[in-house]
Structure formats: C-alpha cells, structure tokens
C-alpha cells in the first residue's frame, strides 16, 4: 500500500464538457443531442491523479450541469488534505452533505477510487476483492426512435458483436413491442433489457412484458419501469412477469 503521506489530496479540479451524441438519445421522459457533463480530476501529493465524470440527466434524476457544478464547488474543498485511501468515509460525508446530488458525488467518488488505485498500483477489481476477471457480456443502449431507425442502429451494433440490447421504452406500449419484435425477427440470438425510465404505469409495463413474451423475445431485466417511489408496482411487476426489476 502506498505511503499515506504521499496519498494526500492536494487539488480537486473540475470543468464542464459538451459531448456530442451521434444520434439523438431519446427516453420516455426526455431527449438529448449533447451530453452536458462535468469532468473531475483529483491530484495527490505524490503527483498521482484520478479522474471521474458527472453525467447528469435532469429528465431522470433532477440534476443538471449547473447543480453539479454548484455541488462540486462545495464538496471539493472538503477533500483537500484528506488521504485518498479514506474514500469510504469521504463518500459517506459527501452523501450526508449533498444527498440530492448523486451525479456530482459519483464524479468525485470515481476520481477518489481511480487515484487510490493508481497510488497503490493496483487495479480496481483487486481493491474490491474481485478474483474473477473473465470477459463479461455487456449491453448497448438503443434510444426511442422509429422502427426503421431502431433496426438500423441495432443492426450496426449487432455487426460489432453485441447481442444484448438495452431498449429505451415507456412512451408507447404497442410501438415499443413492435420495435423489439422487429429486432427479434431480424437479429438472431439477441435478448433485451427494457429501460422504461419511469415512463410506464404498472398496467402498461405488464402489457409490454406480455407483448414481448408473445413474440418470443427474451427479456432479462426491466429497468426503472415505473416512477421510482412506486415500490408496490415494482414488486408486482417482478412477481407477475417473473422478470427481474432494477430501479
């Protein structure tokens, strides 16, 4: 483990960055053509650094870049002089100070972990006790779009090896089912994550899941199907569809 005297946080820098999105990113609660994010860099006394990023999406989480920058302006000074290896305690303090700013905290926590691992010269998985480093299957997100555009986007990613598609849904049950069915018919061996971004009612989500089941689609997860406080509906959806729910 790196000497604690060399792992003291001496500087926290942050700056806004606009990241153009190739295709409009449309979800049930809004759309975006530019990601208005914030980068964070934490520097240690030995010159080691770590990076993090805040990616607020106001239509989903209520945060925007301005609120992130405001939160960072208050949180950053509290990290100066602290040991980066005390990231757990620092994260707890930040959560207490800014409970409604998870994107801003995420940027700082990621930078803390990055700097801590670089300082200790270990990978992140080792820090957290991971032992299995086999390749994993990941997904690619397809925004809400016309059926033709959806198929075009998915086909491009399919040709690059993706077989698990996280589909943004939640605005039109019948249209959502048709979009997924078109991919199911055209791209063999795929499966879906249905990401509603809180756009469905309980009844609509049940209908969506049933529609996918009827054409033989494989739904491995439903993400944010209903409003975040409707725990009863989430439990009912999990119970009645048999599909895991993440929120």
Model-derived segments and spans:
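N-terminal capping/lid subdomain adjacent to the active-site entrance of alpha/beta enzymes
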Residues: 2-192, 197-206, 210-213, 240
């Amino acid at each position: 483990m790196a000497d604690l005297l060399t792992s003291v946080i001496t500087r926290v820098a942050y700056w806004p960055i606009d990241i153009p999105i190739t295709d409009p990113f449309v979800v049930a609660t809004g759309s975006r053509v530019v990601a208005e994010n914030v980068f964070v860099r934490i520097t240690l006394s030995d010159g080691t650094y770590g990076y993090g990023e805040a990616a607020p999406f106001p239509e989903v989480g209520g945060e925007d870049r301005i609120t992130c920058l405001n939160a960072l302006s208050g949180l950053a000074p509290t990290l100066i002089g602290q040991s980066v290896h005390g990231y757990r305690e620092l994260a707890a303090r930040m959560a207490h100070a800014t409970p409604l700013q998870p994107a801003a905290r995420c940027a700082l926590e990621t930078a803390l972990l990055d700097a801590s691992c670089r300082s200790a010269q270990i990978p992140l998985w080792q820090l957290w006790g991971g032992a299995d480093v086999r390749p994993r299957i990941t997904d690619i997100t397809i925004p809400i779009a016309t059926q033709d555009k959806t198929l075009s986007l998915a086909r491009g990613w399919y040709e690059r090896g993706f077989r698990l598609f996280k589909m943004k849904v939640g605005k039109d049950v019948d249209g959502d089912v048709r979009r997924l069915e078109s991919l199911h018919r055209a791209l063999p061996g795929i499966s879906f994550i249905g990401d509603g971004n809180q756009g469905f009612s309980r009844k609509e989500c049940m209908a969506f899941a049933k529609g996918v089941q009827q054409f033989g689609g494989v739904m491995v997860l439903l993400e944010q199907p209903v409003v975040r406080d409707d725990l009863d509906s989430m439990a009912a959806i999990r119970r009645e569809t048999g599909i895991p729910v993440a929120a």
